[in-house]
Amino acid sequence: DKAEMDVADVKDQQPESMELIDVPAEVDKGTSLKDFTSTLKAKVTYADGAVKEVAASDLEFVVVPDMETVGEKYVVATLKKTLLGKTADKTISANAKFSVVAGIKSITITKAPSRTKYYFYNSAALEGVDHTLAFDPTGMEVTAKYVEGEDAVLENSKLTFSRIPATPGKHEVTITTENGRTATVEVNVAESAVKAVTPSPVSLGAEDCSTAWWTEFTENMKIPAGETFEFNFTNYTSGANNYNNYVVILRKADLAEYAVVRADNYGWGNGYAACTPIGTQGDWATWLATMNGAKVKLFVTNCNNGTADIQAIVTGTDGSVTTQSYLGINTIDPSDLNVAFTVDSSHLKFNAASARKHYSRAHRR
């Protein structure tokens, strides 16, 4: 296949085939054909292989069998223009399936979510960061009242939810349907308790930083819902690559991973895509040069909303302070969140845990 081409660079070509894109799965009853099709597009392939995205204004549409009744429908688009917009020798067409649905008049929360008490911890790593929490719809049931027909329970995947400030107190979450109908639910947010923890073993990886990737690990440490574990350790690195430093693993007791995150603003796993990685390392070479012997204070919070936060404050060997956070790692089962560390041509020495006063961002002076 040839890449999508600039029409200015090619001779005129006849259309050969096309595919409709951006077709919504559902359209409210009463929507006009013009309004429905105004945002549709088609990906058109021409005789010599050129590919062009064509706007709705260059297409003609019909809906089969109609737009007036509820049910499954097909939108059929036709194109009568060449690549350069002249009348084509033949007309081509494409179709796509969608459904006309009775419009939602209002929504009501008919079953409360399972978890409405969330927790946060704002360390110094989040100075200047607008920290928010995700709403957890687990267990919630939202019922829609339609303009016509019977009431029905909506899938939570068809709803959107407002973010929640990571500040103590009661907060209102707005639940919104695709057609703009809203309802609200209240959640309570509290600052997490912090517990200093020392993993076993306290010395992880060979002292000469020769330990290979994914060969040595600390024990799994289970973080109860609503708690934050604090780890203090010295990080040693071979200095070969940015990723040859500490690595944090969030996983279930059976070792199924939620996410794996590194010291250099990078990670992966089912829960990683939803998170916000925030690193202040700046120039990588300068940062890496300070990591062999860097002091790390790292926090992991079980937010009890299906997410976890990781925050690290790193004091380099030159005295510079950088931070690394991963906020909102999701797919977390709050009753089965475990943290472990591993190394990759690196070595970690953990400090013994001791009771100490913990300063959150809000309490720093």
State the predicted function of each range.
Residues 226, 331-365:
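Ligand-recognition surfaces built from glycine- and aromatic
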Residues 315-338:
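Short, solvent-exposed beta-strand-to-loop segments that form ligand-recognition rims
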Residues 273-297:
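Short, aromatic/His-centered strand-loop micro-motif at the edge of beta-sheets
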Residues 14-50, 105-150:
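Solvent-exposed, low-complexity, repeat-rich "mucin-like" stalks and linkers
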Residues 203-273:
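Secretory/extracellular carbohydrate-interaction modules
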Residues 25-27, 50-85, 89-92, 149-187:
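Serine/threonine-rich, repeat-prone extracellular segments and beta-strand-based repeat modules
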Residues 5-12, 96-102, 187-191:
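Interdomain boundary/hinge segments at the C-termini of tandem beta-sandwich modules
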Residues 293-302, 310-312:
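Short tryptophan-centered beta-strand motifs in secreted/extracellular beta-sheet-rich domains
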